[in-house]
């Protein structure tokens, strides 16, 4: 199957798993999300590029102030129409300029709705973007957390009220004296900023690092690219952590690894959740939330141990989008814990995690 369009950005041919996202806004954040590492990302919103790209400014320890990582993560971008003219008070460059600087190959003029229907019905598949005159690309390597995680332990602190205001855009307590270990499978920088803005000290460790001898108050297990089969050492570490009682929180792949450590089985979703409008119901209540997800697996309901319970259920397909321990502060979710823009009158899952430290 072939789609023909016009190239923009890098002129290099690329290959990778083709995935989609149906969000209306947020392409700078999506393009820097480590979960998309090595993939070809198809955006369904019909016009991309009209508000440019914000500052790539980095804070201490290479923490991005605006984006989700230090660089673009996918190998390719597929869109319907590209807007060369951009306007936004935070914009510093055009999308195409950024793509050329970071060697991201793009194609526009594609019926992204039709492509997304194919991906939705048949599941993710490999694809190629080949600009005219370019050689056929090599077969893609399978993405892994090892490609995007930190290589050593990194400590982040928000030491002053001004630090917190710079991170969060609003004033908050400078510190709560709590230390959170972030297991980096490809952590989004907004998560680290969100933890700092809530007064925590963040210790970021590689995904296969045994941190159990460290002093900490809670553990956050991040999302990331690839398959949980690459993370057996992480599962073994989490098994030791779950023997204790300190708060543990994870989303995406982090949720899946917590579930495996607890003894759950994972199932591949017939239709991957790759959008910002996934409805989830909080069990035991009549409350429904609209969640942002980028996952292709969920926990098998029948495999959940007796000491755990379903926390959130997806209302589209009935998938288990969250579990929690009945007596200990352990939570895993398939969706982002909303640390940037959201319903400010609601307590987010990240707030709930911080409150239990």
What function would you assign to each model-found segment?
Residues 111, 252, 295, 336:
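Active-site glycine-centered loops adjacent to acidic/histidine catalytic or metal-binding residues
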Residues 222-292, 298-301, 342-352:
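Cysteine-nucleophile active-site neighborhood
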Residues 105, 179, 247-249, 265, ...:
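Proline-centered loop/turn at the N-terminus of a beta-strand
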Residues 179-184, 291-292, 331-335:
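Active-site-proximal beta-strand elements of phosphoester/diester hydrolases
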Residues 1-208, 228, 340-342, 348, ...:
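RNA-binding accessory domains that recognize and position tRNA/RNA substrates
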Residues 287-328:
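Catalytic beta-strand/loop cores that center a nucleophilic Ser/Cys/Thr
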Residues 179-243, 247-250, 257:
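Phosphate-binding active sites in nucleotide-utilizing proteins
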